[in-house]
Structure formats: structure tokens, C-alpha cells
């Protein structure tokens, strides 16, 4: 039995996504839950279904996609170029099979940047610290976002003398609103995060990453802050395989509705 947990706000994108899920996902006697983000009571509900041992899937914005408009209310600007990730039992995709490259090529043909450009080889300067939202940080790390920033900064200073800059997720009421992370990735030595998808921006703009092991970038990143001066920089073959793998884990509304998402995810034995 499929249960789609709606957010109690009629503008929430879940109201567009859940009809696609119920149409494209086979319904069985086994309980299967779908959650959109961690808003509302989703954190509590996810814990409840996990404690029962029931299957649950996390749905949120895609990894390589045309951005949605977020403010003043969320809006899909181009359904053909907007992708959503569907992840079993976690917030990010961290396991699965490397695809053939067909889905990756489709993204490229749509004008979505999926081209690995290598790594900076010249002098680098600062470290960019990009925390996840307060909700995700507490869910993953069990501490506030502020405490996470303090702890990580303190630990980094044991291993580097580089400038440490903090960049939060842009919101209308903060200093990063209207800014582009690419500007802060220039001359950046390494981006450090827990679960932020800023990690994707980094590796796609020649900057290595240190992140939580549950971050989608985890397979091509370092995980221990002691490696800050020499973070992992995988070769092109590894990065291209990672890109193919990630492309197998995000889907358009049409692909969710017509069963493509279910089929592709089942082929990966997730």
C-alpha cells in the first residue's frame, strides 16, 4: 500500500509529485511510504516508519536539474528539464549501479551541465564551509547548524591555516541571497559540508570535497577533516562513472508518472 505523506501547504511541490508517484509506482500489500523533504512532521514520521521496519522513499530536488523557483512559492519552470531524486531509506543516493550513460547524455542534450572539468592545479586559497539546513544538520548530525559550524571550524584549524569562509543556503533574508556559489568556488582549495548539494557545485567546478558519508558526493570525496590539505581528487574515469550513476537516480515528473523511475530504480536493485 502506497502512502504519500503530504505537506499541509497547497503550494508544496509534493502536491504535483504524489499524483505521479501513485500513477507510476505499483501498489502492493506491502506498506511503502513517500516523503517530500523533511518539512512538516516528516522527521517524526520517517522515524516511526523506520522503527516499524517499513519501506520508505525520500523525494526532493534532483542532483543535476534546472532549478525550481523557490520564492515566494515553489514553482517548476520547465518540467522537461526539472528532475527529482527518489532515494530509498536515506536523504541522498549513495549506492547503485553505474548507468550506460544514456541518461547522462539526455541531461547534456537538455543543456544541463554534467561535464566534469577536472581539478584546479594552480594555487588555491580558502576553504568553503557549506552547512546543510538546520533541519538536515540536526537530523544527520544530532546538533544545531551553528554548533556544527563551530565544531568543524575548530577541527579544521588543527590541520590548516587557510582562511575558512562560511556559505549558507541562499534565502531572501540572508546575506547569500542573490549570490552565486561559483564566485566563492574561485581559488577555493576545498568545500566542506555535511549533506549540502553545494558539494555537487564544487566537484563540477574543479573543487574537491570533504563531506558526510551519506552525501551523494561521498563516493568521490574525502570524509575526514584531517585530509583538508590533500583532499581526494578522483580521476576522470571515476568522476564520469559517478556522473552516470547519479543520473540513474533522478527523474522528471513524466518519468515518475509513466513508470520509468520505478523501472530504473528496480534495475539497480536499490
Placement of each model-derived feature along the sequence:
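Short, well-ordered secondary-structure micro-motifs within conserved domains or adaptor modules
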Residues: 26-60, 188-194
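Donor nucleotide-activated moiety binding/catalytic core segment of transferases
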Residues: 26, 157, 162-209, 214-217
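Leloir-type glycosyltransferase catalytic cores
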Residues: 73-124, 220-270
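A basic- and aromatic-enriched beta-loop-alpha substructure that forms the phosphate/nucleotide-
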Residues: 45-105, 196, 202-204
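Residues that mark the start of a beta-strand
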Residues: 1-3, 32, 125-128, 207
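Short, solvent-exposed loop/turn segments at secondary-structure junctions
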Residues: 9-12, 38-41, 62-65, 132-136, ...
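Catalytic donor nucleotide-activated moiety binding site of glycosyltransferases and closely related
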Residues: 3-9, 130-131, 135, 143-182
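N-terminal pre-catalytic "stem/leader" segment of glycosyltransferase-like enzymes
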Residues: 1-44, 135-136, 263-270
Amino acid at each position: 500500500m502506497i502512502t504519500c505523506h503530504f505537506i499541509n501547504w497547497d503550494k508544496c511541490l509534493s502536491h504535483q509529485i504524489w499524483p505521479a508517484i501513485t500513477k507510476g509506482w505499483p501498489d502492493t500489500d506491502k506498506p511503502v511510504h513517500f516523503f517530500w523533504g523533511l518539512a512538516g512532521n516528516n522527521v517524526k514520521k520517517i522515524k516511526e516508519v523506520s522503527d516499524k521496519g517499513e519501506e520508505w522513499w525520500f523525494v526532493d530536488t534532483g542532483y543535476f536539474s534546472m532549478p525550481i523557483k523557490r520564492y515566494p512559492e515553489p514553482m517548476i519552470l520547465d518540467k522537461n528539464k526539472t528532475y527529482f531524486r527518489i532515494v530509498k531509506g536515506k536523504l541522498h543516493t549513495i549506492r547503485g549501479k553505474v548507468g550506460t550513460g544514456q541518461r547522462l547524455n539526455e541531461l547534456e542534450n537538455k543543456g544541463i551541465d554534467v561535464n566534469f572539468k577536472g581539478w584546479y592545479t594552480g594555487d588555491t586559497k580558502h576553504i568553503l564551509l557549506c552547512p546543510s539546513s538546520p533541519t538536515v544538520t540536526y537530523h544527520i548530525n544530532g546538533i544545531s547548524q551553528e554548533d556544527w559550524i563551530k565544531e568543524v571550524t575548530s577541527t579544521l584549524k588543527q590541520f590548516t591555516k587557510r582562511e575558512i569562509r562560511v556559505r549558507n543556503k541562499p534565502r531572501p533574508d540572508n546575506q547569500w541571497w542573490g549570490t552565486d556559489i561559483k564566485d566563492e568556488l574561485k581559488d577555493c582549495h576545498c568545500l566542506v559540508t555535511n549533506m549540502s548539494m553545494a558539494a555537487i557545485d564544487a566537484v563540477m567546478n574543479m573543487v574537491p570535497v570533504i563531506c558526510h558519508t551519506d552525501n551523494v558526493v561521498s563516493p568521490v570525496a574525502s570524509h575526514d577533516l584531517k585530509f583538508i590539505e590533500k583532499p581526494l581528487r578522483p580521476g576522470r574515469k571515476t568522476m564520469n562513472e559517478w556522473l552516470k550513476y547519479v543520473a540513474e537516480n533522478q527523474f522528471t515528473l513524466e518519468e515518475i508518472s509513466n513508470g520509468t523511475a520505478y523501472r530504473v530504480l528496480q534495475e539497480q536493485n536499490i
